[in-house]
Amino acid sequence: MGRQTTRLTLDNLEQLPGGCDACVCWELDPVRRAQVRGHEAEEKAGWVSTVLRQWGSCGRVVCVDDEPVGHVLFAPGVFLPGTERFATAPASQDAVVLATGYVAPEHRLGGLGRLLVQGMAKDLIRHGGVNAVEAFGAIHPRPGECILPVDFLLAVGFKTHRPHPSYPRMRMDLRTAITWREEVEVAVNKLLGVVGKRREPVPDHRATRRPL
């Protein structure tokens, strides 16, 4: 079973599972959401287009056997007015916000969420100028709520940055992701037999031996 992540684009936006292609609870404030009711999919596409054009990568999609089964959405806080509803807002100025994510139920508990977060971190490291990722997590997640569970965020490397009884603000330093990448590269090299196979020349002590 092949699985891989790719960047969120207008071409794969409509393929997102769970109706996420028409959810704008993070992208618009409550007043604007009421004004565009019935046209959420168009607004979501417009939002993705704007962020891609003005800032860069804003999401990752995970595919299993070429079928999209999950995604994460992220952007600087200025593009996510929906964060203003949280008591722990706003996000730090040096951070990008991981707004939400979704994995189809039949594919959960298989590490796809972690794969998505790692793909996001890779995009942000390449983008540059971002020190961390922050997210508003739910301590007691409710069905249909587009807020990532705190337990998931803790499991993929986030720490509590600003406590709250219901929706704390979590943070992951991108240096953590860089360290993870370095560890993976070492592991891969070991598997390929690169590490440990380079032998230093054995010095010939006879050539440098001095008479007693």
Describe the residue ranges of each PLM region.
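Conserved GNAT acetyl-CoA-binding A-motif
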Residues: 117, 124-144
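Conserved acetyl-CoA-binding loop-helix of GNAT-fold acetyltransferases
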Residues: 103, 109-125
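C-terminal "cap" of GNAT-fold acetyltransferases
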Residues: 146, 164-205, 210-212
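Conserved acetyl-CoA-binding loop of GNAT-fold acetyltransferases
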Residues: 149-163
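Conserved N-terminal entry element of GNAT/NAT acetyltransferase domains
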Residues: 1-38
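Conserved acyl-donor/pantetheine-binding loop and adjacent beta-alpha core of acyl/acetyltransferases
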Residues: 38, 50-57, 63-100
